């Protein structure tokens, strides 16, 4: 998926194991500002703990990663009946406000749809962000650390 932001083209790509892009995404995650998930996400990339169809996605401006998301069977919540999770949606501060998170989410939705899923779920603490992308608030959920987040869902066809 390509989008143009002024003079900069943003490309969303699926990240495959043992590729240059996977190594670049790991370096991006090891340095990003979302401290609460940085180590967990870096470990998942280092160990490549993605199974079957689970995968990360990267948003690139030129050859530089500026954002990411993942799609997985499970997330940091004791809710095994919910699947697939679009998670770890992150855009570097300089590139925020340019709808890159929307593009990452849409790319993950397209991927899920191609796999035969009809609904996707996003956990978040944000209010008003995912609603703009067609998600609806389902309920508050408690993660394994005991923190409360919001669960959003979207029918994707």
Could you describe each region identified by the protein language model?
Residues 1-20, 156-157:
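Conserved N-terminal entry element of GNAT/NAT acetyltransferase domains
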Residues 24-25, 86, 104:
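Residue-level preference for hydrophobic side chains embedded in well-ordered alpha helices
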Residues 30-60:
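Active-site rim helix/loop that mediates acceptor-substrate recognition in acyltransferases
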Residues 54, 147-151:
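Short hydrophobic/aromatic beta-strand or adjacent loop that forms the aromatic wall/cage
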Residues 58, 64-74, 85, 90:
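Conserved beta-strand in the GNAT
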Residues 74-86, 96, 144:
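A conserved beta-turn-beta hairpin within the catalytic core of GNAT-like acetyltransferases
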Residues 91, 97-110, 122:
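Conserved acetyl-CoA-binding loop-helix of GNAT-fold acetyltransferases
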Residues 114, 118, 124-148:
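Conserved active-site alpha-helix within GNAT-family acetyltransferase domains
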